[in-house]
């Protein structure tokens, strides 16, 4: 401790060093990025492949399987899923947390190249990949609306100008455009007119394709000049396509307009997007891996005025959803809680010490310790987020403890008549080891957390490091700045304080005397106290087993995502009506601010909705209550279901599921999976622990099976290719030509007119021109019948899979839900060929649940080892750790009282309590050991004196920690659902621990002391005096 005396004798140097720490922290604070939570994204890569016209089963077997076999060999892949639908396949790879996304992308490209020879030759392009998780919620949604421009024109502006520019913004990973499709010239044929003229659909296709050909024409030149040849070989609008001559019939020209309606329209008419009941084009913006949401959103917002100026004034570019306001509001709430916590802690010190000068010392020590932590956060690449700021809020109650212990001890010597400088030297020497033990053992709690693997370890690393740094700074400041300030600020004089403060001093003295009397009685009835101590251990076990558990508290981010699932045979027209109906119901809710949705494209029976809630300050209910209220109204809509879930900052897995949690069924036999999945889904839907149960298995889509009579076809001179071309030309929205423009390329799309595409009997009107030039109706050589067919085929790994998604009912817990699912699977007697496993967030929850007790045990063991080293004793660390059971009981009872499930946040609270409550025991044990060794008194008298002597600092430190956590309990603003479990756990644990450990610790100390004496002397253990 002689080293620390230098800081007392050199106040200027000490002050300047303190200022340097504070200034460095302030500068670092201004440079720290802002985010809702630490970056814990699993690296995810999405691979897409297409084969137009292929059914889902063909896509799964010929495209998905070869890709999966090659991709599955990549190192670090922890989950591989695929979904194959009509003409397209998407494979999602999720990698280990420590896998570099760029290195993984190179391996993915190599695997795609290796699988290329095994893929079908008819694929229009090679499979491509993107470093974006398709299940992530967008960070921003923009909408384009206009009263003068068509949806196709708006889509063109969005995809050609806006999306390209936004995608170049730093931090943006992907920009997808929905609600319509690119402009196109649509040729809608009349089969009856064509039949009367004897013209085949393929002849029309060839004529249009040949009429719009962009080819180089060359040039001519002489000795002086050169001319580039440019012909009018391109047709760019519907107006110039209509006069095209398709055929001559008896010398009369048959033009395209005679047999078709030709219009300027869009490539795919089966797309629809809306925002607040108005047609809209929707741009959903996702962030790149590891990109900061706030910084990315700010960059996009900075570009918006320029983007608006680049499009016509009659087009409105609006922000439909933005993630950043609730993040900023949540962080502002945490910062406010931090300031309140500092104020409350300083108030506690003032009330106890009744001196403005004495209070000034921790009032300086606490902010400097916290502000200095920002420097370490910046150097470690951390961000200002809910968890790191919560760590500093909780640290307020910790960092003041060291200053309080030093200050209180020095004050005691000054009050006894010692000069301030001498009191500072003696006081810091007496409690230096105590302060060191308290701080080092508290930091030791976080060692297992820092070494923890997986998402929880990555998630709480910033929390643990930030808290540890602040505690380390507090230790340094309490041994340097605090004694220096005590030496030059404190004086021996009666405190001039208000009557209520003097009254508090008298009350504290009376409380201390009452504690002394009760402690004497307790030490005389130690067996009863020991029984209470053992009972708290048993109660801990029972409470932990019985309390509902969840992975992470349900956040209220002010955003909901909705997924519409309709009958598998629904038409686009009916699906669009469903979308409008659902949006109307949601929009009428008083807490809803904005609703955006779209349907169509390859999503034949589904749609998506993005819902923004009003700010929490003007809302009547939180997100979960809004969902529960809407769920009852939405259930009345026939033929479709809308599944709602609150957007969370932590979402694991790459599945685009309709709910927050997933349970995946896998089988090597697709037929067995299709047999058992409906039974399991029905049984799970009946569980009260689950809500919104649905499945991604869709094997009941309607199709029309055509059977060719090949002999008749051969006799009539018709090939299978002719027949397939007929059907594709008529019903496939076939893109038959390309229109080249300066900024983009557009298509000429051909199919039969809408009255024919909307009626199955139109097949009777289809015909083929055979090799003899005769029109042969399709019904002459083919028959058809309705049948069921899968809309998608899914894989997990290389097995056929079906994922059942579910939400939790209002007030439900994930532990009850997972237990209910496992219980149902056992009761159903599902065969071994069908396997079930939790996926995504539910899977991580199951893994975390298994490691929670191990983590707590590791923290206790680490603290024991550290204390054993510091005290050079096997016994005394056990005395100090005896404070933990009562803290655990208090924490779990408080969670039960507030109806909060045991989550990762609550687990961190338990870890913190391990570090907090042992401080009381350390102060008692330190002084008792010193009294025994140097004072020559008995263990009974030593611990009794230590308890009375340290009563005031124990009360001060406990109340400081309690008041430091209290703002987290009382918070009700944005992000409160994250902060409250931590505050509830700490406050509950401190209250119960304070009431019990003031009595159990001295009793356990005496028992262990006598046990130690027995081993030393080899004598029988005598009973404690009664």
From Swiss-Prot:
Primary site of residence: membrane
GO cellular component, one term: plasma membrane
Alphabetized Pfam families for the sequence: ACR_tran (PF00873)
InterPro entries documented for this protein: AcrB_DN_DC_subdom (IPR027463), Acrflvin-R (IPR001036), Multidrug-R_MdtC (IPR023931)
Domain of life: Bacteria
Keyword Nucleotide-binding tagged: no
GO molecular function annotation: xenobiotic transmembrane transporter activity
Localization (cell): Cell inner membrane
Gene3D superfamilies cross-referenced by the UniProt entry: Multidrug efflux transporter AcrB pore domain, Multidrug efflux transporter AcrB pore domain like, Multidrug efflux transporter AcrB TolC docking domain, DN and DC subdomains, Multidrug efflux transporter AcrB transmembrane domain
Membrane topology, record value: Multi-pass membrane protein
Disulphide bonds in the chain: none
Regions that span the bilayer: 12-32, 333-353, 360-380, 387-407, 431-451, 463-483, 528-548, 853-873, 897-917, 953-973, 984-1004
Keyword terms of this UniProt record: Cell inner membrane, Cell membrane, Membrane, Transmembrane, Transmembrane helix, Transport
Statement: the UniProt record of this protein carries the keyword Transmembrane: yes
NCBIfam families attached to this UniProt entry: PRK10614.1, RND_permease_2
Oligomeric form and interacting partners: Part of a tripartite efflux system composed of MdtA, MdtB and MdtC. MdtC forms a heteromultimer with MdtB.
Family: Belongs to the resistance-nodulation-cell division (RND) (TC 2.A.6) family. MdtC subfamily.
PANTHER family assigned: MULTIDRUG RESISTANCE PROTEIN MDTC, PTHR32063
The protein's name: Multidrug resistance protein MdtC
Protein species of origin: Serratia proteamaculans (strain 568)
Higher taxonomy: Bacteria, Pseudomonadati, Pseudomonadota, Gammaproteobacteria, Enterobacterales
GN (gene name): mdtC
């Amino acid at each position: 401790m002689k080293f620390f005396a230098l800081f007392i004798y050199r106040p200027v140097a000490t002050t300047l060093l303190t200022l340097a720490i504070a200034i460095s922290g302030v500068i670092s604070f201004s440079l720290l990025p802002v985010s809702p939570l630490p970056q814990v994204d699993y690296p995810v890569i999405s691979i897409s492949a297409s084969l137009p016209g292929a059914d889902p089963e063909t896509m799964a077997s010929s495209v998905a399987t070869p890709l999966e076999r090659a991709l599955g060999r990549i190192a670090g892949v922890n989950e591989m899923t695929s979904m194959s639908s009509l003409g397209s396949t998407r494979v999602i790879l999720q990698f280990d947390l420590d896998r570099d996304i760029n290195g993984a992308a190179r391996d993915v490209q190599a695997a795609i190249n290796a699988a290329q020879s095994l893929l079908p030759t008819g694929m229009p392009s090679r499979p491509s990949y993107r470093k974006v998780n398709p299940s992530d919620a967008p960070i921003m949604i923009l909408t384009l609306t206009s009263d003068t421009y068509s949806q196709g024109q708006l889509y063109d502006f969005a995809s050609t100008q806006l999306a390209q520019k936004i995608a170049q913004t730093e931090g943006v990973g992907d920009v997808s455009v929905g609600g319509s499709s690119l402009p196109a010239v649509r040729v809608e044929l009349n089969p009856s007119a064509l039949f009367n003229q004897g013209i085949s659909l393929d002849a029309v296709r060839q004529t249009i394709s040949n009429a719009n050909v962009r080819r180089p024409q060359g040039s001519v030149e002489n000795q002086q000049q050169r001319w580039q040849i440019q012909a009018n070989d391109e047709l760019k609008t519907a107006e110039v396509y209509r006069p095209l001559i398709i055929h001559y019939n008896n010398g009369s020209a048959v033009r395209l307009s005679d047999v078709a309606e030709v219009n300027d329209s869009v490539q795919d008419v089966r797309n629809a997007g809306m925002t607040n009941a108005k047609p809209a084009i929707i741009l959903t913006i996702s962030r790149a891996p590891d990109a900061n949401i706030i910084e990315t959103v700010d960059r996009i917002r900075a570009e918006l005025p320029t983007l608006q100026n680049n499009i016509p004034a009659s087009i409105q570019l609006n922000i439909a959803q933005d993630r950043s306001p609730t993040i900023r509001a949540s962080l502002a709430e945490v910062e406010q809680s931090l300031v309140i916590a500092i104020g409350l802690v300083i108030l506690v010190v003032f009330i106890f010490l009744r001196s403005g000068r004495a209070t000034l010392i921790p009032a300086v020590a606490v902010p400097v310790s916290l502000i200095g932590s920002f420097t370490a956060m910046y150097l470690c690449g951390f961000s200002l987020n809910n968890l790191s700021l919560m760590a500093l809020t909780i640290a307020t109650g910790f960092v003041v403890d060291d200053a309080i212990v030093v200050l209180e001890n020095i004050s005691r010597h000054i009050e006894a008549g010692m000069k301030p400088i001498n009191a500072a030297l003696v006081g810091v020497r007496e409690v230096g080891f105590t302060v060191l033990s308290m701080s080092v053992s508290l930091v030791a709690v976080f060692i297992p957390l820092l070494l923890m693997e997986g998402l929880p370890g990555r998630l709480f690393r910033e929390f643990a490091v930030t808290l540890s740094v602040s505690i380390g700074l507090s230790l340094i400041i309490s041994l340097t700045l605090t004694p220096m300030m005590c030496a030059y600020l404190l004086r021996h004089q009666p405190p001039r304080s208000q009557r209520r403060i003097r009254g508090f001093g008298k009350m504290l003295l009376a409380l201390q005397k009452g504690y002394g009397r009760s402690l004497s009685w307790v030490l005389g009835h130690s067996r009863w106290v020991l029984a209470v101590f053992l009972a708290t251990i048993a109660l801990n076990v029972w409470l932990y087993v019985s309390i509902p558990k969840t992975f992470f508290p349900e956040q209220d981010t002010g955003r909901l995502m909705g997924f519409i699932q309709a009958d598998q045979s629904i038409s686009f027209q009916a699906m669009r009506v469903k979308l409008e109906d659902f949006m109307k119901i949601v929009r009428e809710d008083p807490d809803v601010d904005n609703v955006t949705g779209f349907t169509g494209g390859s999503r034949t029976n589904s749609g998506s909705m993005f819902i923004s809630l009003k700010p929490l300050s003007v809302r009547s209910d939180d997100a979960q209550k809004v969902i529960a209220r809407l769920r009852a109204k939405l259930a009345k809509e026939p033929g479709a279901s809308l599944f709602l879930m609150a957007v969370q900052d932590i979402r694991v897995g790459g599945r685009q599921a309709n709910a927050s949690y997933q349970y995946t069924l896998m089988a090597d036999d697709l037929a067995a999976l299709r047999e058992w999945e409906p039974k399991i889904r029905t049984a799970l839907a009946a569980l009260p622990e689950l809500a919104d149960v649905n499945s991604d298995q869709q094997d009941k889509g309607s199709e029309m099976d055509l059977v060719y009579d090949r002999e008749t076809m051969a006799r009539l001179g018709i090939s299978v290719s002719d027949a397939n071309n007929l059907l594709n030309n008529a019903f496939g929205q076939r893109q038959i030509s390309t229109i080249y423009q300066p900024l983009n390329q557009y298509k000429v799309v051909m199919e039969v007119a809408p009255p024919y595409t909307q009626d199955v009997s139109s097949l009777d009107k289809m015909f083929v021109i055979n090799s003899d030039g005769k029109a042969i109706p399709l019904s002459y050589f083919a028959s058809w019948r309705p049948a069921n067919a899968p809309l998608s085929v899914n894989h997990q790994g290389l097995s056929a899979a079906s994922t059942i998604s579910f939400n939790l009912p209002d007030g439900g817990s994930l532990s009850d839900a997972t237990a209910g699912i496992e219980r149902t699977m056992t009761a159903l007697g599902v065969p071994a060929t069908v396997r079930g496993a939790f996926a995504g967030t539910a899977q991580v929850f199951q893994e975390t649940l298994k490691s929670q007790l191990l983590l707590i045990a590791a923290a206790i063991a680490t603290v024991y080892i550290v204390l054993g080293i510091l005290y050079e004793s096997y016994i005394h660390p056990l005395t100090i750790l005896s404070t933990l059971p009562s803290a655990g009981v208090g924490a779990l009872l408080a969670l039960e009282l507030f109806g909060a499930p045991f989550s990762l946040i609550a687990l961190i609270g338990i870890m913190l309590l391990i570090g907090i409550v042992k401080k009381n025991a350390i102060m008692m044990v330190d002084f008792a050991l010193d009294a025994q060794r140097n004072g020559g008194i008995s263990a009974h008298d030593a611990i009794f004196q230590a308890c009375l002597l340290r009563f005031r600092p124990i009360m001060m430190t406990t109340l400081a920690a309690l008041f430091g956590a209290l703002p987290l309990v009382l918070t009700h603003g944005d992000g409160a659902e994250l902060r409250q479990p931590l505050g509830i756990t700490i406050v509950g644990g401190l209250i119960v621990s304070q009431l019990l450990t003031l009595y159990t610790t001295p009793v356990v100390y005496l028992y262990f002391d006598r046990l130690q004496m027995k081993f030393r002397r080899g004598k029988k253990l005598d009973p404690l005096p009664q």
